[in-house]
Amino acid sequence: MTRPIEVRKVPIEHVSDAAGLADLIDAGVFSADDVIAVVGKTEGNGGVNDYTRIISTHAYRAVLEEKGTRSKEEVAQVPLVWSGGTDGVISPHATIFAYAPEGRYLPTDEPRVTVGYAMSEVLLPEDIGRPAMVEKVAAGVRVAMERAGITDPADVHYVQTKTPLLVQDTINDAERRGETVYTHNTLESMDVSNATTALGIAVALGEIEMPTAEQIFHDLSLYSSVASCSSGVELDQAQIVVVGNARGVGGRFRVGHSIMKDALDMDGVWAAIRDAGLDDMPVDCIHPRHIKGRLVNLFLKCEADPTGRVRGRRNIMLDDSDVAWHRQIKACVGGVVAAVSGDPMNFVSVAAVHQGPSGGGPVIAIVDLEA
């Protein structure tokens, strides 16, 4: 049986700031050795050449090494999943998942947060966008579920991943070995990597059957309702963090999910918050005061609707040559979500093909039932 989990959100006040993590460790909220995973937003451009993710990784790993007993190699295995780009009001921050100190919480038959993590097999450049990547990710998700003590996929509410994308060096490497890659457009490869990973999650959880090569990044009817996939240049495997609920674990946190049907779907956000356990709010709740400080964080994926319209109204995000649609839709959804939560420190990430319905995306909420 896994141990009870602490989930805490801390601000990032500058690009190399890890003081929030250090303060929690110093305060005895959890030990450095018990940190399982970190999911956060960094303030870079969110693109291929966003190195703020690497800076945050170094800063957080340094704290874990300094304040814990794990070796550098062991700390390197802790998933640190950073999504770059804090467009609009989105505020840089980190959500930290850690085992609670022994004896702090008693076991309970009520569902409480449990976390498992895994690293996939190495993802080769030629795997990205193809069935091999789907299979490798699916296998990793199953390992993470087992480590979380989850046997029923219905108890999984959030799967956060970080996977490699393509850069010119890895494209050249594949071609030197006689292999081909899905795309030579490195920015597009971010979307492709995320999309393929999401299908691996969906396969592992039984949401879909194994897709064909032709369906990857094309058949938008295939998606996972709990996948949140990011990609970057800093790794060559899939980092996989599975968050769900389990009975008998204990603790004070619970996770739930829903979907946003489009970029303006506040009801989808409220549905996720209620699904996580805050079901005492009015059905027509439209104000953050009803949350009463019990929401730890929201995690969302978003995508510009490929039709170029939202609720029938035309927009030009996909035609804008000055500001990439990635940044525009992220800022839009970040504002919508902040209006619901009353807090701009939400995890909002873009490139959401196969993550929720086309033009929408998954919404995951983690709540503190004792706040």
From Swiss-Prot:
Keywords: Hydrolase, Magnesium, Metal-binding. Gene3D superfamilies: Cyanuric acid hydrolase/Barbituras, RU C (3.30.1330.160), Cyanuric acid hydrolase/Barbiturase, RU A (3.30.1330.170), Cyanuric acid hydrolase/Barbiturase, RU B (3.30.1330.180). InterPro entries: AtzD/Barbiturase, AtzD/Barbiturase_RUA, AtzD/Barbiturase_RUB, AtzD/Barbiturase_RUC. It holds the Pfam family Amido_AtzD_TrzD. It is an enzyme of class 3 (hydrolase). Pathway: Pyrimidine metabolism; uracil degradation via oxidative pathway; malonate and urea from uracil: step 2/3. The keyword Iron-sulfur does not apply. The keyword Metal-binding applies. It comes from the Bacteria. Mg(2+) binds at E303, A352, Q355, G356, P357, G360. Responsible for the hydrolysis of barbituric acid (2,4,6-trihydroxy-1,3-pyrimidine), an intermediate in the oxidative catabolism of pyrimidines. Catalyzes the hydrolytic opening of the pyrimidine ring of barbituric acid to yield ureidomalonic acid. Can also use cyanuric acid as a substrate, albeit with lower efficiency. Belongs to the cyclic amide hydrolase (CyAH) family. HAMAP family: Cyc_amidohydrol (MF_01989). The monomer structure is formed from three repeating units (RUs) that share the same structure as one another. The monomer and the active site possess nearly threefold rotational symmetry, to the extent that the active site possesses three potential Ser-Lys catalytic dyads, but one of the 3 active site surfaces varies in composition suggesting it is involved in conferring substrate specificity. Homotetramer. This is Barbiturase 2. It comes from Nocardioides sp. (strain ATCC BAA-499 / JS614).
